[in-house]
């Protein structure tokens, strides 16, 4: 992890197959690194695991759904507060997780959902998204291929969408999500500099 953040316009931590609760040194290092990121005042975007790392750093738990649900597929989020402006043109996003975060104190909830109540929040100039707006059609296919190869029953988890329905929704929402991400980066994340 870089110790000098001055060359960066923004910092993004993406998702991954690991859990923020795993006892791996690199996860602990990323959680600790958040102190430097926040103090640098550089805009930050946490996506899925990245959002959970921010929440964990801010003192909140990241836990499995109490009804043992997963979100693997496309799900609607409900904008809250400032999220009404952020998500006014797009509120269905691709998700791939079995854990969710609590909203830390002094943070602003931006969106909530059904299975995982907290979907997005803001802390100072940091945005945390539980979902994956960065995943396009090819990345989506690659993820499904790699995950199904390792865990062939993952799409049978309660709450998950089947492969064909996910692909149908990918075709339906791919362009709108891509446009939303471009707008979000320009009008919210990078506008904070």
Name each region found by the language model:
Residues 16-17, 51, 98, 133:
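Active-site metal-binding loops of divalent metal-dependent hydrolases
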Residues 22-24, 55-57, 105, 138-140:
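Short glycine-/acidic-enriched loop or helix-start segments at secondary-structure transitions
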